[in-house]
Amino acid sequence: MGSPMHRVSLGDHWSWQVHPDIDSERHSPSFSVERLTNILDGGLPNTVLRRKVESIIQSDPVFNLKKLYFMTREELYEDAIQKRFHLEKLAWSLGWSEDGPERIYANRVLDGNVNLSLHGVAMNAIRSLGSDEQIAKWGQLCKNFQIITTYAQTELGHGTYLQGLETEATYDEARQELVIHSPTMTSTKWWPGDLGWSVTHAVVLAQLTCLGVRHGMHAFIVPIRSLEDHTPLPGITVGDIGPKMGLEHIDNGFLQLNHVRVPRENMLSRFAEVLPDGTYQRLGTPQSNYLGMLVTRVQLLCKGILPSLQKACIIATRYSVIRHQSRLRPSDPEAKILEYQTQQQKLLPQLAVSYAFHFTATSLSEFFHSSYSAILKRDFSLLPELHALSTGMKATFADFCAQGAEICRRACGGHGYSKLSGLPTLVARATASCTYEGENTVLYLQVARFLMKSYLQAQASPGATPQKPLPQSVMYIATQRPARCSAQTAADFRCPDVYTTAWAYVSTRLIRDAAHRTQTLMKSGVDQHDAWNQTTVIHLQAAKAHCYFITVKNFKEAVEKLDKEPEIQRVLQRLCDLYALHGVLTNSGDFLHDGFLSGAQVDMAREAFLDLLPLIRKDAILLTDAFDFSDHCLNSALGCYDGHVYERLFEWAQKYPANTQENPAYKKYIRPLMLGWRHKM
């Protein structure tokens, strides 16, 4: 287990004595927490390096996070900018490479409280969509911060539907320039991070027109502000969109372009280019221009979305062994609230989700890296599957992490409503992920189209090997399975093959039913597009089931690989069982629909689920400790490693500046009101 010095880093005078209620949870562990941390990090060397980086960050006063809860929005923005450029100087002095693990670990401990994250997204787009010459030019400028960029895709009137983007890029062959223009109010770029006050350039997504022919969405590098005094350039209207639900430190912005001219060479041209005479040449597929967004989406899973749920689990679980409420028996002292089955039922499934998603993200990352280099070489055979997997997992991660973080917040009662708990910030960030980089429902429906296409491909040659093999992730839909679950007892439902088969069966049935319903409507004369729209609710249900099956399968396979770590394998197997069964019980109607499960079998699954709760509860603190987020990173009065919740809440509240300042409302309103009533009396 990591040392208390590593984990406790807030400098409070009581931090070196761990509260006995949480200390007892760590006695006689059933597995090595340190070894599990190494597994989650991808090996001991990674853990060592991560902690070294975190120690450097946490010892630097510029990176302090404790004052964030008391700052204004403008102060939060300036603080986040200061942190980013201090980090760049530090990285340069220590020789950290742009894409090295040190950067990832530094951002992990800073918990997203640095700005210019869209600078990295824009660099991803340049590396993915730019030619070698463009990468050499623009990539170096970005790397050296000679320019600061953002990725400007979303518009006031369009988001996830990229074909509907209205911003225009018209090629002027006489001057060999591209004219970038916002023709309508709704074509205003809206939401790009860092655009409001910070960036000098933007990778702008716009509809390309050459010689009067429209060629769809492409990416263009457009200067936004002067490199001399940071004022907007001619034809540019730019600013901040105003207050938001969360992410107050980020200057999300708007951008209007009034016939702004850029050189022809500013169009990113790995997969398409415009020749000087206006001839358009496509070097890839129409979907190639989504590659930059796909890269960002894969990175978001582990670095941007999942940590919110992991941290929420740590905070809520630690608080739940410190908080005592009511009695299990009249003669007993008040019990830790984690002893109550209802609290376990809230929190432990979220812990299971955190682990399931970690191993799923690892699997997807491996698939991404194995296919990305091929795509850059214009081999697009794996692009549809990679798009479907990344899209489905982004939607699934965002949905479950937002819901789970909120469940954790509510599980902490009133204290979870305090920003000092850290939970409202985590909930707001997870909630934002449900709409940025694609609105989740739209993303699920993109997965559904892929599933329907794959299902029809499988049905074209039933019982035979199809001419074109099915993508690996959907091969299960062509497999014949029993129409009834084989489980006879509650214990049977803790067999991975039983619940994995159950999820594969239900997912396949829902995909089949959605495809058949769409085809039936089309055969009855309904237009193809209308038929799709009239069945999207069914397709959405199928896509969600497919995504859940993928996560169950990935978790199961990850646990199976831990056969040389029997203690860890045992505890993770319980979490895997809980994750799969929680999904079955939450969606029991889908399993009962055609009799795959009987009512009695659902009762057995519930019994198995409830039996798992006390087993996992014994290891709950250790399982959250294994995520190895330091107190600095959690920045939570409720979730510190030492368990001194109430002392920390009280001390942090004393630091609120308003508590030591004169209250202007007293003289202006309260005192006159009180005096007025006294005179009337």
Curated annotation (Swiss-Prot):
It catalyses: (25R)-3alpha,7alpha,12alpha-trihydroxy-5beta-cholestan-26-oyl-CoA + A + H2O = (24R,25R)-3alpha,7alpha,12alpha,24-tetrahydroxy-5beta-cholestan-26-oyl-CoA + AH2; (25S)-3alpha,7alpha,12alpha-trihydroxy-5beta-cholestan-26-oyl-CoA + O2 = (24E)-3alpha,7alpha,12alpha-trihydroxy-5beta-cholest-24-en-26-oyl-CoA + H2O2. The keyword Aminoacyl-tRNA synthetase does not apply. GO terms for biological process: bile acid biosynthetic process; fatty acid beta-oxidation; fatty acid beta-oxidation using acyl-CoA oxidase; fatty acid metabolic process; very long-chain fatty acid metabolic process. Most abundant in liver. Also expressed in kidney. Not present in any other tissues tested. The modification N6-succinyllysine is found at residues 66, 137, 303, 453, 561, 667. GO terms for cellular component: peroxisome. GO terms for molecular function: 3alpha,7alpha,12alpha-trihydroxy-5beta-cholestanoyl-CoA 24-hydroxylase activity; FAD binding; fatty acid binding; flavin adenine dinucleotide binding; palmitoyl-CoA oxidase activity. A motif (Microbody targeting signal) lies at residues 679-681. The keyword Oxidoreductase applies. Belongs to the acyl-CoA oxidase family. Homodimer. This is Peroxisomal acyl-coenzyme A oxidase 2. It comes from Rattus norvegicus (Rat). The lineage of its organism: Eukaryota, Metazoa, Chordata, Craniata, Vertebrata. The gene is Acox2.
